[in-house]
Regions:
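Non-catalytic regulatory/gating segments with a bias toward low-complexity or hydrophobic composition
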Residues: 8-9, 70-75, 91-93, 134, ...
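Short acidic/polar hinge/loop motifs at secondary-structure boundaries
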Residues: 45-76, 94
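Outer-membrane beta-barrel translocator domains and adjoining extracellular loop/strand segments
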Residues: 60, 139, 144-152, 189-196, ...
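Transmembrane beta-barrel wall of Gram-negative outer-membrane proteins
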Residues: 103-105, 110-188, 214-217, 221, ...
Length: 313
């Protein structure tokens, strides 16, 4: 099944997801457009989750859980989505919404390399005008690459995520949604194989195993109005994305300092911190049977990024 954004490539023709040096920043390739960016930047494919724009590549290694359906709209979609400057298209993920009755499910998975996964979701009405949904995910996987100096398995991964949503229907035809979600990913750094110094593709020698720790929080307020003559949709969102990354740049087990040996080992570090506030408003025709349809929209975003990046010698 589809458990991450990267899994969409298994069911979507002419769409490929590939990893670079960071498991939480997969790159996309679609319609002959391939991303080569290293770091933070705009994507060739845009991503929306529950109407919230995920505008940079750092937001795309997320887990998908309690999803109702996923749409992929090929080509530029500036008419429908304000944040879409992506030429390749838009991935539109729609989570399941609470209904008139209580429903829920739980899942347990186990796989190779000690993979363990637990999923839980429940949704239903609190009152006649208020619904609630909760979903959560925990995933853990052991590493399968041996670091020869220590004998330990590296590149293990652990993730936990949760989302809480309230749906208010104060009076027809209004629907208001309040959403909060949080995700935590603790990943061992993807080992880079060096044919000159490593014993094989699954055996490496590193004095610093490396890690990638990622925290993401999202808060959103959505309001929808569906009238006889027009429809109105508003999405106000705040997202914070933080990452702490460390990797061995010299691809050896030589410790620091060894300058007297004529070799200086290098450790790469990066700590990006991104905050974004966005407001999107869409106004459209109300009757789908009319001979003409119209749409009008506005999008505003205020994005601030700080990044501490460099090398330790």
């Amino acid at each position: 099944g589809i458990q991450e954004v990267r899994d969409i490539q298994t069911v979507l023709p002419n769409f490929t997801v590939f990893d670079a040096n960071n498991t939480r920043m997969p790159k996309f390739s679609v319609r002959g457009l391939r991303e080569n960016n290293f770091g933070v930047g705009q994507s060739v494919v845009g991503l929306y989750v529950d109407g919230i724009p995920y505008t940079d590549m750092m937001s795309r290694g997320l887990s998908l859980y309690d999803v109702d359906h996923i749409e992929f709209l090929r080509g530029p979609q500036g008419t429908l989505f304000g944040a879409s400057a992506a030429p390749g298209g838009i991935i539109n993920v729609r989570p399941r919404q609470p209904g008139a009755e209580w429903v829920g499910s739980a899942g347990l998975g186990y796989g190779n390399h000690g993979t363990r996964e637990y999923r839980l979701n429940a949704s239903g009405p609190l009152t006649g005008q208020i619904g609630v949904s909760f979903s959560g995910l925990y995933n853990d996987r052991d590493g399968f690459v041996t670091n020869l100096p220590t004998g330990q398995e590296i590149d293990g991964r652990e993730s936990v995520a949760g989302r809480l949503q309230f749906v208010l229907m104060p009076r027809e035809p209004w629907t208001i949604r309040l959403t909060a979600s949080s995700e935590r990913y603790d990943d061992g750094f993807t080992p880079t194989y060096s044919p000159l110094s490593d014993a094989g593709p699954f055996k490496v020698s590193r004095d610093v195993p490396g890690y990638v720790n990622t925290d993401v929080t999202t808060y959103a307020l959505s309001a929808d109005f569906s009238g006889e003559h027009f429809t109105l949709s508003s999405v106000t969102a705040f997202r914070n994305w933080e990452q702490d990354l460390q990797q061995d740049f010299d691809f050896t087990a030589i410790p620091q300092p060894v300058a007297e040996m004529g070799f200086i080992p290098v450790i790469g570090v990066s700590q990006p911190d991104v905050e974004q506030f966005s407001q999107e408003i869409r106004l459209g025709s109300g009757d789908a049977n009319e001979s003409y349809q119209w749409t009008l929209g506005a999008y505003y975003a205020d994005r601030e990024m700080d990044n501490v990046s460099g090398s330790l010698y």
